[in-house]
A protein has these predicted regions:
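N-terminal secretory signal peptides
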Residues: 1-23
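Beta1-alpha1 glycine-rich phosphate/pyrophosphate-binding loop at the start
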Residues: 2-10, 48-128, 234-278
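FAD-binding core/adjacent interface of flavoenzyme oxidoreductases
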Residues: 18-34, 41-57, 130-245, 252-258, ...
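C-terminal auxiliary extensions adjacent to catalytic cores
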Residues: 56, 444-489
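A Rossmann-like FAD-binding core segment of flavoenzymes
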Residues: 82, 124-136, 251-367
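Extended hydrophobic secondary-structure segments that form protein cores and membrane-embedded regions
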Residues: 86-90, 227-233, 264-272, 341, ...
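FAD-site-proximal beta/loop scaffold in flavoenzymes
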Residues: 175-222, 339-405, 415
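Internal hydrophobic alpha-helix adjacent to the cofactor/substrate pocket in enzyme cavities
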Residues: 403-427
Length: 489
């Protein structure tokens, strides 16, 4: 990734602003971006490098070479005078731009080639990359066994292996089994076929989603009355806004084709809210109502009958039971009901989990994630192990924006530990979700562990804005690929 991609993005932004009669300076001033030199094409990235490198020594092993792993490796390489860093990653294209899958699935990006990159092209100088998979962990002996049988030792370890897409947990999709966002999609595409079933969570299936969406729109244009449903599972997921983003974008494309009136759009969520932050949930509810998009809570997708085009949900709720005189309260009775919903178009957000070889290992937890102190990102049991990104057991936030805050904290804290000190930096739970609500509009949802909006800019964060669309579509990719993966943004 070269600076010319950032320049190209800025040229596109300038062109769009010019059409609106607004200068880039005025637009960024309006958006409160005056100090964000990186977005304005300035030198924030260069200025963010560590002023003085540490002379701390130690063999550092990083499990996972995606955005979190490579960004961390790069910042460590920039922060140590004599770094000894090895990254374990089986996928040669692990750094592909995952945040762009919703844009690919809606035809904003024309090809997956705009998202897929070779990991070796982003490997920091002096960092060793081993194309293999970690399958066994012995934290007491500081050793990791690879799929090849090789055993590596380490002084310090960082786990950034991401999540597995557990399609196989859904009845009817067992043949797919487990998949990865950047991984092989042959089983996904084979099982989905041309049934109208899609998922934005794999790059190849996201590309196929645009084909399925176009075919669906053509049917709607012909006058057919159709039903599209969008799901969110009963597990933590990466980019929790994606299930809603794709629904908004399908709605937008249907409106463009003057076919929206022939389609019923419904969102089925396992949870009981549209967003974890009330202010954003309220805003989304208003947006759904304005767009005639319906929603149902407490519905978990448990099965799909592909041939009959029926989605099967477990609807769950609680009721008051008998009154307990001793406790002076009613017993809470959990209820379940099987609900079958016919569809013409189905977007599946698969259940997600840490890879079993990690989540169920000695460094994992009962819930399968890597247990870390949510503020320091240090393992709760092993002080020489850290974790970040989707695999870390933090209360909320599995997005690239979360990683952008986490990896800087982790690097500083790891170096402190390497120097024999206590971790001194704290991650406050910052998460950002650029929620695409229309083609040309984004609501920039920023929040942290307070579960309150934490806007970086002096604008109402619950409002949909064109300037955030420009940032999402044109600026975030070069910032991620050029800035974060070099350990500087």
């Amino acid at each position: 990734m070269k600076n010319d991609e950032m320049k190209k993005a800025l040229e596109v932004v300038n062109s769009e602003l010019k059409k609106a009669g607004i200068s880039r300076r005025d637009a960024f001033k309006l958006a409160g971006l005056g100090g964000a030199a990186f977005l304005a094409g300035g030198t924030e990235v260069k200025a963010s490098t560590v002023a003085k490198a540490s002379e701390a020594k130690g063999k550092i092993l990083i499990i996972g070479g995606g955005l979190a792993g490579i960004s961390t490796a790069a910042r460590l390489a920039n922060s140590l005078t004599d770094p000894d860093i090895t990254v374990i990653e089986p996928n040669p294209k692990s750094v592909s731009y995952q945040a762009g899958t919703t844009l690919l699935a809606s035809g904003i990006y024309s090809s997956k080639d705009e998202l897929v990159y070779e990991t070796k092209d982003f490997l920091p100088k002096g960092v060793t990359l081993i194309k293999d998979k970690a399958v066994d962990f012995n934290p007491e002996a500081n050793k990791v066994t690879l799929a090849s049988g090789d055993i590596l030792d380490y002084d310090f370890m960082i786990v950034a292996a991401g999540v597995v897409l557990d399609f196989g947990a859904i009845k009817g999709l067992e043949e797919i089994g487990e998949a990865y966002t950047n991984g092989d999609a042959s089983k996904i595409l084979k099982v989905f076929g041309n049934s109208g079933i899609t998922s934005v969570y794999n790059i190849d299936s996201a590309e196929d989603m645009w084909k399925q969406t176009q075919a669906f729109i053509e049917r709607a244009k012909s006058g057919e009355k159709l039903k599209a449903i969008f799901t969110a599972p009963n597990t933590a997921v990466k980019c929790g806004g994606a299930p809603k983003k794709v629904m908004y974008l399908v709605n937008s494309r249907l409106n463009e084709a003057n076919a929206r009136g022939n389609v019923d759009l419904t969102y089925y969520d396992n949870s009981d809210k549209l967003f974890s932050v009330k202010e954003y949930a309220d805003a989304i509810e208003k947006q759904f109502i304005a767009r005639d998009m319906k929603w149902n809570f407490n519905h978990n997708l448990v099965g799909v009958d592909i041939s009959k085009k029926i989605a099967i949900f477990n609807k769950h709720w609680e009721e008051k039971g008998e009154y307990d005189k001793d406790l002076e309260e009613h017993e809470i009775v959990k209820k379940n009901q099987k609900v079958e919903v016919p569809f013409d178009f189905l977007h599946i957000t698969p259940p997600q989990k840490a890879p079993d070889e990690i989540g169920k290992s000695e460094i994992g937890s009962d819930k399968g994630w890597i247990p870390v102190n949510k503020e320091t990102l240090q393992h709760v049991k092993y002080s020489n192990i850290f974790a970040l990104g989707d695999i870390a057991a933090v209360p909320m936030g599995k997005t690239g924006g979360t990683v952008r805050k986490q990896y800087k904290v982790l690097v500083d804290n790891l170096i402190s530990v390497m120097e024999g000190k206590e971790p001194k930096e704290y991650f406050g739970g910052y998460t950002v979700c650029p929620l695409i609500t229309d083609i040309g509009k984004v609501m920039l949802a920023e929040f942290d562990w307070t579960a309150k909006p934490t806007p970086s800019f002096p604008l109402d964060p619950t409002q949909e804005r064109w300037i955030w669309w420009l940032m999402k579509v044109y600026m975030l990719k070069p910032m991620t690929m050029h800035g974060m993966l070099s350990g500087k943004a």
